Amino acid sequence: MLKEFKEFALKGNMIDLAIGVIIGGAFGGLVNSIVNDIFMPIIGLITGGIDFSNMFIQLAGEKQATLSAAKAAGATISYGNFITLLINFLIIAWVLFLFVKSMNKIRRKQEEEETSKKMSLEQQLLSEIRDLLAKKK
């Protein structure tokens, strides 16, 4: 049983998956930084200095000026955080879409090259017949 687990864990797909998860985690941090440190300030500037991280609806307690104070005072809906996460998601989805699209294009090109290199059985036989006829002349 231990041997089977070792074979399973050391298969290429499992290792590839582990590497993908690690890279995905690092990519998530990078996207968060891009969104929070670059895009959100620009969007805030365009929208008149609105700070999305501090946008909320307070459901209970006295009205507070900041999200952290409102959360301490009672229930809140943090829709600014949702907007930020939505932008994160859209950026990640767009980058992954471009990556998959380029990988599919590369794969299609390789398949076309392999297909053009491989001759069908008929083509091989005709080539052999042609070569034999050329030798007889």
From Swiss-Prot:
- For the keyword NADP, the answer is no
Membrane-spanning residues: 15-35, 38-58, 80-100
Extract the Pfam families matched here.
MscL (PF01741)
Which membrane topology term applies here? Multi-pass membrane protein
Q: Which UniProt keywords apply?
A: Cell inner membrane, Cell membrane, Ion channel, Ion transport, Membrane, Transmembrane, Transmembrane helix, Transport
Any one GO CC term of this protein is: plasma membrane
What do we know about how this protein assembles, alone or with others? Homopentamer.
Please give the function described in this protein's UniProt entry. Channel that opens in response to stretch forces in the membrane lipid bilayer. May participate in the regulation of osmotic pressure changes within the cell.
Q: What is this protein called?
A: Large-conductance mechanosensitive channel
- Organism, by scientific name, is Bartonella henselae (strain ATCC 49882 / DSM 28221 / CCUG 30454 / Houston 1) (Rochalimaea henselae)
High-level lineage: Bacteria, Pseudomonadati, Pseudomonadota, Alphaproteobacteria, Hyphomicrobiales
